Regions:
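Conserved non-catalytic scaffold segment of RNase H-like nuclease domains
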Residues: 1-116
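Short, intrinsically disordered, charge-balanced linker/junction segments flanking boundaries
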Residues: 117-121
């Protein structure tokens, strides 16, 4: 079965204006088979109290600017790696299903934005 569970951590709750800071994707039914990556979002304007991650999101996720600076990768690289993980762990003869807890109102909107930005580059 080609079912994958997708979860994003983001800089806020608006999927149209905020950015992804962490990707987690896991093949359903395979406990130790997953992919995660920190993603560098757009920097905040000069003079902001933080570079990437607002304090309320740090409190919620535990993800800090330091973690993003040291381990974050470009959005295009993160998107490529996410798709590579899915393709490498799929049976090419069967459809791929991607599920998410808040898919239609949150994660899938970010997912679509990432795909569109990747294709445009």
């Amino acid at each position: 079965m080609n079912t994958f569970i997708l979860d994003f951590e983001t800089t806020g709750l608006n999927p149209y204006t905020n950015d992804v800071i962490e990707i987690a994707v896991k093949k359903y039914g395979e406990e130790d088979n997953f992919h995660t990556a920190f993603v560098k979002p757009k920097k905040m304007p000069k003079g902001s109290l933080y570079t990437y991650v607002p304090p309320n999101i740090v409190k919620l996720t535990g993800i800090t600017d330091i973690m993003i600076d040291s381990d974050g990768i470009l959005n295009s690289v993160a998107t490529y790696q996410m798709f590579k993980y899915i393709v490498d762990n799929s049976d090419t003869e069967k459809p791929i299903y991607i599920v998410s807890h808040n898919g239609t109102t949150f994660d899938f909107i970010f997912f679509k934005r990432m795909v569109c930005e990747y294709i445009e580059k």
